[in-house]
Each structure stands twice: as C-alpha cells, then as structure tokens.
C-alpha cells in the first residue's frame, strides 16, 4: 500500500507538471541554492557531484568523500559505521548539515555516515579546518553539507534501479516540476543488502567461520519532499521534509585482540524525520536576510543478543536500548554589501536538543542542552589579486535537564552546567594570474563536549564529568593552486594544528575507573598534493597523496586510532566517445592503529573498475569493487568485502 501511494504521488506530480505553463529555466541549477553554505573564504574544490557518485557507486556520504585529499575513510567496526576523518578530526568535530540545517545526534555526536544515502543529494561538500561562523559551534575540524535537488524545468525525472553482490537491490525516483512561482520536488529511495562476501584469502575465526560475513545485512528507505515559492526574483521560501527508516546488523569482531569483547548487536530501527523551512529575502540593494527554522526527530532501537543466533537476550550483556531524541532550532544570516568590495554576514543560531534513553524494563532518563551562537563573517576584496576573510563567533552551551540515576527516592540529577567558547579565523588569498594562486589562514576553533562525554558511566567503567570544558584547536594552513600547463594542474596544502584541553579518557580515577577530562595536548601536522593531468583528449588522470603525523604530547604511549600516515588515491579515466566511459581507481593506505595500545590494521592497496554506457535518457553503470579480491580491513578484526559487483540503470528526463 505504501509503495502504491508513493507511485500515485509521483504520477500526480508529473501530470500536474505537464499542464504547467512554460518558463525560462536556462539559468537555473538543479542544486538547491538555498541549501548551499555561503563560504566566504577561498577554498579548493571539495565538492562531489551526484554524477560522480553514480559513476563510482558511492552509496553513502563517507564513500563520496573518500577521494578528497587529507580525508581518511574509516570504519568504526564496533558499530559497523563507515565514516571519515579529516586532518585527524573525527565526525564529532566535523558537523553534518543538510541544506545548511544541522543534522545532530544529541547524545554522542557520532553521526553514522553510512546511513546517509547520496541518491537524493545533488552534491556533497566538505570544508577542512576553516568553516563559516554562520554554521554555529563545533566546527573544530571543518564541516559537511549535503545539498538536495531542485527542479529546473516543467518536468524533471530521475529514476534508478540496480543490483549488486550479496543479494543487493536498489530503486528510487527523483521527480520535480518548476512553474513561474512554485516548484515541487519529491524523491523515494530504497536499498537492501543481505550480506557481503569476504576475500578468498580470509582465514576463518571463531566468530567468522566462512566467507559470508555474519550479521552484515542493511536496509534503507528514504522520502524527501520539497515545496518552494518564489514571491519575487529576490524572495524565495521553501519547506522541506525528510524521512528515513533504516536497519542494519553489526558484524562481530573476528580478530586477534584478546582485550576485545565480541558483540552481537543489531539495529532493527534507525529512524529520522526532519522538517525545515528556509527563506531568503532581499531587503534593499545592499541587505538581504536568510532564515531557517527546523525540527528533527531521531528514534533508534539497538538490540544486544546472547550469541550469534540473534534470538535470545538472557545474559548480563544482553539488552535492548532505545533512543528518542529531538532537536529544535533556527538560524538567521543578515548579509550586507554597503562597502564596495566587501561582504559582511552577521548570524545567530539557537538550538535545543533533547536525548531520551532507556533500556527495555528500565525508566527513561532525559538529558538536554540549549546552545546559542552569534557570529560574524567578512570578506574584503582589496584588489583584483588580494582578498581577506575574517570570522569571529561566541557560543554558549547551557544544560536544561541533567537526569542521572533512578533511585528509591526518585530520579537524581547532575549539577547544572554551562560552557562558553570563542572562535576566530583569518585568511588571505592571492591570485597571481590565471595559472597560480595561494591562500593562507589561521583559525582558533572549539568543540563542546557531548552529552555522552559529560554524563556517561561507560557501563559501570567510568565516572561522569558534567564540568567538561570545550576542547580547542589552533589551525595554520598554506595552500596553492598551480596550472602548470593547459593539460596539468596541481593543488597542494600544508597544515599545522595544535590541540589544547583535548577531551580524552584518563585512567586510575577512584580505583580502576576512568573519566573523560580536559587532559590532553596534541598536535597534527601534514600536507597533501593533488594533480589533474589530461594525458590525451579522452584520457585523464586524477591523483593525490596525503600525509599526516599525529602526536599525543600528554601521553605519547597512547596512539591516535584509525588514521594512517600515508594515503594515495588515483583515478585513470578513459572516454572514447561521449556515450561510453571507463575508469580504474586505486587507493593505498599505510597501516593504522585500531586501538590506542598498539593493535594495528595492516596496509593495503585497493583497486576498483567502473564504467558507463549512455543512450538517449538512459545510462547503464556497472563495476567491480575490490578488483583483485584483497583481504583488508580499516579496523583490525573487522574484515571488509572481497571482490564484488554492481550494476544500475538510470533514467534522466530534464
């Protein structure tokens, strides 16, 4: 019934569009412009289009960004969550936005990027280190913005169906219509995978006795709706609704580390709903205002079972955990261009988040924060060659509800707590000529501690610390872009990051307990180099090398995890005609620590082959992932898929 209703919805949309009046859409982009983040500072191109995601079979956001220099693809094996690490910062320090609206997981800040499917996003954008103050707090390592589609014509339709290894199937549709004053956009996507197969070189273990990876299923369902109204050329209003209903298993640990506990976990429910309103209005010649209001709900059920049968919950470590979280907030950006060559943005953000959790059979506990932020972003064009960009913001976090434990007398609470942070950044950009440009920036960025870091007992192994202060990072970056010739261009960045008051676990508190404290000092330093080389008119090479050193200066014996020193990414693409394309991709990662006490995941090379054929409105994509069936892992004990295949057919009507 649900699929029938969706089919009827899209049919009505198309019929309605066919009867709409014609308008001039030649200058309209299919990228939802109100959803783009205004980045005043200069940057290199860290934007991935949907076209590239289809070609490379990048299903989720973490896969989409793996080609970006200084971005490390990782897999949080203990939770089966693919993610990225940018210049040493994990996802807690790289907030995710959808059309500029914050996508938050209030409790731990660990957004599962594997749950964010790329099909209904026109582009995935990343900033590294420096980010607009208008995004609010916690952008200590950068930001990610997922920009949805908007219709460009009377009828826009994109439909997809595909098959893959492990009994994988997918199908979806994007449909939209633009009229003189109104536009509508709607999409539905569904994907299912039963399992993935390990490499033929994999050696069986106690909890993984064959190549068919245990408990590796996943299901995705998503609906995305948008309604827009253009009152005037400089006045636009949109209301947007997104709904996701996902599920997944968590493959058990199958490594050699005796300290690791094998978990038998499943997430039968991962549900998210977002409703947001965005408007942009020109007040007069020099002033405009952009406003957004949003509400977000997240419902999560996680089941811990007794064993690999995933049927009983009788042992002490077996439980069912339920999260029921909410976010409510808004953002106002006032832009002024009164001074020639200058753009000034003043922004205010507010957010109220609430985390409700309980294990089945236990009472619910609630933790809640209120956060507000005020910021300035300014860019001044000195002349045709030089420009300066500055930013300053102040943020404050205040606890609203701090429930601790349930006792015979009732629910106890932690002390109320409040924290503040100041962020600042300054960048300069020099354009020598059409072939060469340089930029440099210095930034002081912060991140507030999450609810989990402040209040968690770590299943009886830790002590809470409500007074945990924000951690701080000082960034220095120098970048250059050089067009060596019409066929060769090179980009490079060097960076140095100093971290203070690092939020980390400290042992030996009240016996054998641990506590999260502002106890760390660290530094990250590195560089990356990327090039694009047009070898022949139909043959090109894109390649990058990234290097990073992470040093824990407080406790050098504790290693930073999941980040290799060396990464190489290359793509050789051949397009003999305008309807056929084939490419081969190579990735290399040196070894990385999986645990802070020294357990490592070995280095590996990974090759992927993909191609496409186009005919009229149809494009057929197909490929082989892990071409040489490499046995590898991003996290020790959590082996990845061996050789696997995909194919998909896309229909596009513009």
Positions of predicted regions on the chain:
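Outer-membrane beta-barrel signature, preferentially recognizing the C-terminal barrel domain
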Residues: 257, 262-282, 323, 412-431, ...
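N-terminal periplasmic accessory domains that precede
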Residues: 61-64, 82-85, 97, 112-117, ...
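Short acidic/polar hinge/loop motifs at secondary-structure boundaries
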Residues: 73, 101-128
